[in-house]
């Protein structure tokens, strides 16, 4: 019985050591965002615009289908977060599994999800991976597109459909 108690207590203490090292998702993504800012991994709006027109760049969005349908950067690809590596294969590889687009800009609302996915994309072999906040795109009065349609979403939030700009951008 003493041995069982010693084992339980030691297991609890040993487990406590690991629990103290646990970092929350928010703290982890914040830490990665700070590192990305310091290392120059945060893309500028001009870099996103240039990437949309470049042959060797892909702008990929890791937000949910609903977020992407509500507002996305025209020309970006939604890869989601569940299996982004599979979705990327259709965008960045040719028929011989060679990179045709070896540079990525990863987009989400505030870059929290993008910075985490960027780590995986770097390990997959992408030469350059940058991160971008779609909120910045919108705040700087760039247009977004929506995948909602007035015909299908009559009870929606009265959002304008098609290309639209943030309200503060109206002249």
Feature locations, PLM:
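Short glycine-rich anion-binding loops that position phosphate/pyrophosphate groups of nucleotides
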Residues: 65
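Rhodanese-like catalytic fold shared by cysteine-dependent sulfurtransferases
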Residues: 20-46, 51-54, 69-103, 112-171
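Bacterial N-terminal signal peptides
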Residues: 7-16
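Positively charged n-region of N-terminal signal peptides that target proteins for export
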Residues: 1-6
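Structural scaffold elements adjacent to functional motifs in cytosolic proteins
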Residues: 59-61
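Short, surface-exposed ligand- or partner-binding patches at beta-edge/loop junctions that are enriched
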Residues: 106-107
